[in-house]
Amino acid sequence: MLPTPSTSHVNFDNVYEPAEDSFLLIDTLSSPTEATFLTDRFSCRCSSPVLLEVGTGSGVVLGFATSWAKKIFGRRDILAFGTDVNRIACKATAQTARTTIAASDAPDESFSAIWGDTIMADLTTCIRPGEVDILIFNPPYVPTEDLPELSEGEYASEFERDSHLLALSYAGGDEGMETTNRLLDELPNILSLKRGVAYVLLCAQNKPKDVKARIRFWEGGWHAETVGDLGKKGGWEKLQIIRIWQDP
């Protein structure tokens, strides 16, 4: 079992703390089934794959995938990036990734990818079309009446700022799917043609069966399957990871 990155440097008053959803993503990516799928998919002598995590939070998932790239993807020349609307989370992710890479690399063997940066952005708005080969998304999936505004604006207090930043990490609006639907709408344009693959976390109230059925109707022959399942309640809701991809 590969070690999980340390996030002891992160202030969880204003950054999403790793929980069951984070660890389910880590377990899924490093599972023998997915490691084999990803290694086979990126085994060709092609350009270096680009890895992007959208909504990095503490950086525990991206740090894990970056530091153990050779074991997960079968190659080290992965270019790893992240985005988050929370500038504090962006800084935390960069530190998590750098620290984890340094800890995982041994003098005689290195498993880590090439660390790029974390960019403060709304989902994939800063990414050029067709550039992402592996996308990871742990969205704000909790059903809520409203979505918090993306703009940080002016805060009356530090508590108000922290509450707003944390709300951005969990509040998903109607059926918990408003932010996820925006990301799904972008996927066919953002992922690299025929090579791109996405891992998206959903909870039962997001209606994953309906989500997968909708993806399968996308033009271009898209697939969507559950590849990771907590198998029990994750906090207050059952969680699963769906893989989204096209045949090469």
Give each language-model segment a name.
Residues T180-L184, Q205-R216:
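Short alpha-helix
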Residues M1-F73, T83-A92, T125-R128, T226-P248:
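SAM-dependent Rossmann-like transferase core, predominantly class I methyltransferases
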Residues S48, E131-V132, R195:
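Local beta-strand N-terminus motif with an aromatic residue
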Residues K91-G130:
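S-adenosyl-L-methionine
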Residues A156, E160, N181-K194:
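A short glycine-rich, Lys/Arg-flanked "PGG" loop and its adjoining helix->strand segment in the class I
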Residues I78-F81:
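Short beta-strand element of Class I
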Residues I136-T179:
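Mobile active-site "lid"/loop adjacent to the S-adenosyl-L-methionine
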Residues R195-L201:
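Conserved beta-strand signature within the Rossmann-like core of class I S-adenosyl-L-methionine
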